[in-house]
């Protein structure tokens, strides 16, 4: 039954933003630094996008960007008809996915296990040691890997002494070893550093959840499964979303430094392909087209990952 009572709708006033020269003067330092950041972004991130025009031209440095012959999508057709580029895409995707999965799982596992260490001194020592490889350049890391996996290196000596092999293996002459070597190098170098954010997420979990699990008789593994991992799931999803777009950034330094003619068919990535065409052979148009392809695919991967995350409610 309606009582005939009409309720007045109260309008919510939207906050108005007033520009004040006095406030601007007070925030002068902040505005100056903000302006510097904006200018930096325009100069180094947006203006270089004009170079994408080279992908649609038969670019010659002598003619310049605005006077080179326009060829449309011819360079892209040439790119995708090149069997080498298709192989490079395979290598980049394979190494990117392997590195993403292996380093992702390794960082989560390391953070969870390190959180279970009760000895404070031991825990901090392990943390510090695990961070150190991140600060080494890839040149140093590849040098260490070369020495360790050489014919007289520690790995071959260990395998021979354990009678696993009879003769030393030339790891850098066999294609089947290259991707695992790259994956191991990434895990060794970045696991400790990548685990920092997971350790921070674990410390933010409500301790009462662990206490309740202990009352219910849960052991360490049960707490990890039902408390720790669900507690850091949002962090995992966010980092996964951020890293999916970097799948095609499988690397350049380590592949370039460890690669050689014997493993070239599995070591070349898109970045190395761009270097070979754009710098070594001087075909800037092909190099730019390959770079655009990489950027577009990365954006598509981010959008897809974002949609999947939304559907899963994360």
Task: Pin down the residues of each PLM region.
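Short, Lys/Arg-rich, polar N-terminal cytosolic tail immediately upstream
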Residues: 1-24
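A structural signal for multi-pass alpha-helical bundles of membrane permease subunits
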Residues: 22-314
């Amino acid at each position: 039954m309606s009582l005939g009572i009409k309720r007045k709708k109260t309008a919510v006033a939207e906050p108005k933003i007033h520009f004040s020269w006095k406030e601007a003067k007070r925030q002068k330092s902040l505005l100056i630094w903000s302006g510097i950041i904006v200018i930096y972004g325009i100069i180094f991130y947006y203006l270089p996008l004009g170079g994408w025009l080279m992908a649609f031209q038969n670019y010659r440095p002598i003619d310049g960007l605005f006077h080179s012959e326009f060829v449309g999508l011819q360079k892209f057709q040439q790119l995708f008809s090149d069997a080498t580029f298709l192989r490079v895409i395979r290598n980049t995707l394979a190494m990117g996915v392997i590195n993403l999965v292996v380093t992702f799982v390794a960082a989560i596992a390391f953070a969870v296990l390190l959180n279970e260490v009760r000895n404070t001194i031991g825990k901090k020592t392990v943390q510090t040691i695990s961070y150190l490889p991140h600060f080494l350049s890839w040149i140093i890391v590849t040098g260490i890997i070369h020495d360790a996996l050489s014919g007289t290196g520690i790995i071959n000596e260990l395998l021979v002494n354990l009678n696993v092999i009879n003769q030393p293996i030339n790891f850098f002459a066999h294609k089947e070893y290259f991707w695992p070597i790259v994956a191991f190098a990434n895990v060794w170098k970045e696991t400790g550093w990548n685990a920092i954010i997971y350790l921070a997420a674990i410390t933010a979990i409500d301790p009462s959840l662990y206490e309740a699990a202990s009352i219910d008789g849960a052991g360490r593994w049960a707490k990890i499964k039902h408390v720790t991992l669900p507690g850091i799931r949002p962090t995992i999803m966010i980092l996964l979303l951020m890293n999916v777009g970097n799948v095609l950034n499988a690397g350049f330094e380590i592949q370039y430094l460890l690669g050689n003619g014997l493993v070239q068919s599995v070591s070349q990535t898109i970045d190395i392909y761009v270097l070979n065409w754009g710098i070594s052979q001087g075909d800037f148009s092909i190099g730019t087209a390959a770079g655009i392809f990489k950027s577009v695919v990365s954006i598509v991967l981010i959008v897809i990952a974002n949609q999947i995350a939304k559907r899963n409610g994360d």
